[in-house]
Amino acid sequence: MTAVADTLAVLVAIDSVNPAYPTLGGAPGPGEGAVAAWVEQFLGDRGIRTVIQPVLPGRSNVLGIVPGRDPARRVVLEAHMDTVSPAGMTIAPFAPRVEAGRLHGRGACDVKGGLAAMLHALADLAVGPPPPAEVVLAAVIDEEHAFRGVSRLVEHLRADRAVVAEPTDLRIVTATKGVL
């Protein structure tokens, strides 16, 4: 597997079901805490400045920041860390497996695959020459329920452009209604 696929497998193995939904056994999901800690460690290990943005008790957004040549410009890469319930899945939700070249597990498509790709993109930017604009990776909470993570993000962060890692059947979408 590639480094991005390896990262995706790690993320899928972490149960980050939104607390509004049941996880395995019917208890409320644990939320994004373990994914947030893993993302913070990934960024820190690569020397990327990290900011923890508290949103709810025990639930925080994680921001990774690569400075750009023009500090007045900013691009945000946004992906959420929570998933929906694994109820009804016919495979083990937190045991990632590759079949026919595709990695399967809860959150692989929505949206831990996008998060893994963005983490590696930011890591690549961090070791090269400074990009034209500051690049901020925003790993946010609560997209699957009430959008409280991205709502907090936009209260405190202005961006000239944003790339949101939501599945779109591989169609580029240049604008849509929403929070970001």
Locations of regions flagged by a protein language model:
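Acidic/histidine-rich catalytic neighborhood of metal-dependent amide-processing enzymes
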Residues: 111-179
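Acidic/His- and Gly-rich active-site-bordering loop/insert found
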Residues: 1-106, 131
